[in-house]
């Protein structure tokens, strides 16, 4: 007997609230923080999110009979209170894997954070976490190279990579830009980088910058005997222009390029990561625009989701904040998404904001990049927080040195190596930070001046987006 079509409107929870459902290993799981309109039951709000982010619409439609809705629909299977927040709750939703195109982060986000975020029944909605099933992970390219290969390419072992952003970020001619790159690299840095908003402006066209930077990198390598590099930002107006810039960086024998993955988009990022994998290039990723999306504690997408998506889309390095610098991010939350960038398995741990177990299988890891308002006094804490598989980037903390960028670079290199040596000797580098740095400064006038210059500089502001734990 054929199914009967009943026209009309029915409550979402009749179809999409399934508290008895046990998620499958192949399901994509999502945790949303929901704040519904007054008077709307939690189950209805949660079911509406499940429906509108999967197969549902506001009215029953006859064409449902042409498919197996029970197979394809998203299911809200659990609701939890948010500690310390009486208005909001967590909704856990399971999505069948067949709802998503293989390897497409663009498609996943279009479904999960598409129209549903404008739904009138919701006052606020935030995607807190995603558990990507292994069946989906295996369809993604992931980092073009990964941590191990990047260390081999750069010949850097046993410590974090050391870098800086060229300042001023805008306004320098190509030749002067290259001069600053050279000063930093000869002073002791491993890498320098374009800032996120340097592309190809009237004061400095991209080709000119690439050529002068390549000259600076090669000269610094010859003088120091070390492998050096510069993140050449290939973000562009069109994908075609992006690839043209990447190809030119390769022609110049540069080891690493850069992309602004949120403003550039996941489709462009995945394409560039695939190109890097085929062409033996490292890929540095900047997260410009992330705070517009992730900083509000009740609405948007948490950065841990954006970090997971980047690992799948592809990148060898990703900015993650600093904890101690000028940018938002507490220690435990930051460690939570650093784990998801680098580890092969990350267990559920609410104290770090991880709502699910996440198995990454054999997918390579991503270097965590600490950048933003950091200087030599922060070095012990940065090493303790980020560990060796990171890149520590001091922009103002290099160029702001009274003796210039080369001296600033030397100060940072001495501070880093002193902290690594102390850690390897078993010292508690955060507790003994002052003693470690002052001892090193006895043999480095550059470090001594840097310590004096920035001794009063702190960024002690309370975190806006705090973990929901008691």
UniProtKB/Swiss-Prot annotation:
GO terms for molecular function: magnesium ion binding; monooxygenase activity; ribulose-bisphosphate carboxylase activity. GO terms for cellular component: carboxysome. Keywords: Bacterial microcompartment, Calvin cycle, Carbon dioxide fixation, Carboxysome, Lyase, Magnesium, Metal-binding, Monooxygenase, Oxidoreductase, Photorespiration, Photosynthesis. Its EC number is 4.1.1.39. The modification N6-carboxylysine is found at residue 193. It is an enzyme of class 4 (lyase). It is found in: Carboxysome. Binds 1 Mg(2+) ion per subunit. It comes from the Bacteria. The keyword Oxidoreductase applies. It catalyses: 2 (2R)-3-phosphoglycerate + 2 H(+) = D-ribulose 1,5-bisphosphate + CO2 + H2O; D-ribulose 1,5-bisphosphate + O2 = 2-phosphoglycolate + (2R)-3-phosphoglycerate + 2 H(+). The active site is at residues 167, 286. Mg(2+) binds at residues 193, 195-196. The record marks 326 as: Transition state stabilizer. One of its GO terms (biological process) is photorespiration. Its main location: other. Gene3D superfamilies: Ribulose bisphosphate carboxylase, large subunit, C-terminal domain, RuBisCO large subunit, N-terminal domain. The basic functional RuBisCO is composed of a large chain homodimer in a 'head-to-tail' conformation. In form I RuBisCO this homodimer is arranged in a barrel-like tetramer with the small subunits forming a tetrameric 'cap' on each end of the 'barrel'. Belongs to the RuBisCO large chain family. Type I subfamily. Heterohexadecamer of 8 large chains and 8 small chains. Forms a CsoS2-CsoS1-RuBisCO complex. RuBisCO catalyzes two reactions: the carboxylation of D-ribulose 1,5-bisphosphate, the primary event in carbon dioxide fixation, as well as the oxidative fragmentation of the pentose substrate in the photorespiration process. Both reactions occur simultaneously and in competition at the same active site. This is Ribulose bisphosphate carboxylase large chain. It comes from Prochlorococcus marinus (strain MIT 9313).
């Amino acid at each position: 007997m054929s199914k009967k079509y009943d026209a009309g409107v029915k409550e979402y929870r009749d179809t999409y609230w399934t508290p008895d459902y046990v998620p499958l290993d192949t399901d994509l799981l999502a945790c949303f923080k929901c704040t519904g309109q007054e008077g709307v039951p939690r189950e209805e709000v949660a079911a509406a999110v499940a429906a509108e982010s999967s197969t549902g619409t506001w009215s029953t439609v006859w064409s449902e009979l042409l498919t197996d809705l029970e197979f394809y629909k998203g299911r809200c299977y659990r609701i939890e209170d948010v500690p310390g927040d009486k208005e909001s709750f967590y909704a856990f939703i399971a999505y069948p894997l067949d709802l998503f195109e293989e390897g497409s982060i663009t498609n996943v986000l279009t479904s999960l954070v598409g129209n549903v975020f404008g739904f009138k029944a919701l006052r606020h909605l935030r995607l807190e976490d995603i558990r990507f099933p292994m069946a989906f992970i295996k369809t993604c390219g992931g980092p073009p190279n990964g941590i191990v290969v990047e260390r081999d390419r750069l010949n850097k072992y046993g410590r974090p990579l050391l870098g800086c952003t060229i300042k001023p970020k805008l306004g320098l001619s190509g030749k002067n830009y290259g001069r600053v790159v050279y000063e930093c690299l000869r002073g002791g840095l491993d890498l320098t980088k374009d800032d996120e908003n340097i592309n190809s402006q009237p004061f400095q066209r991209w080709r000119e910058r690439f050529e002068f930077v390549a000259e600076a990198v090669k000269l610094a390598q010859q003088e120091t005997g070390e492998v050096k590099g510069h993140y050449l930002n290939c973000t562009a107006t069109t994908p075609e222009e992006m690839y043209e810039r990447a190809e030119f960086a390769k022609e110049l024998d540069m080891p690493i390029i850069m992309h602004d993955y949120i403003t550039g988009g996941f489709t462009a990022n995945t394409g560039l990561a695939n190109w890097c994998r085929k062409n033996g290039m490292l890929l540095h990723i900047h997260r410009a625009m992330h705070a517009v999306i992730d900083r509000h504690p009740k609405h948007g997408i948490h950065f841990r989701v954006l970090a997971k998506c980047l690992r799948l889309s592809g990148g060898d390095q990703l900015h993650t904040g600093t904890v101690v610098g000028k940018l938002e991010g507490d220690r435990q939350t930051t460690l939570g998404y650093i784990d998801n960038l680098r580890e092969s398995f990350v267990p559920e741990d609410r104290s770090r904001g991880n709502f699910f177990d996440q198995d990454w299988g054999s997918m390579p890891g991503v270097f965590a990049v600490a950048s933003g308002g950091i200087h030599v006094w922060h070095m012990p804490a940065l090493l303790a927080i980020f560990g060796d598989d990171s890149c520590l980037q001091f922009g103002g903390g290099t160029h702001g040195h009274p003796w210039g960028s080369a001296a600033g670079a030397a100060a940072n290199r001495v501070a880093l190596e002193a902290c690594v040596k102390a850690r390897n000797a078993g010292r508690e580098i955060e507790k003994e930070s002052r003693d470690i740095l002052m001892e090193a400064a006895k043999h480095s006038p550059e470090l001594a001046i840097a310590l004096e210059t920035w001794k009063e500089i702190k960024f002690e502001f309370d975190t806006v987006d705090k973990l929901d734990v008691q």
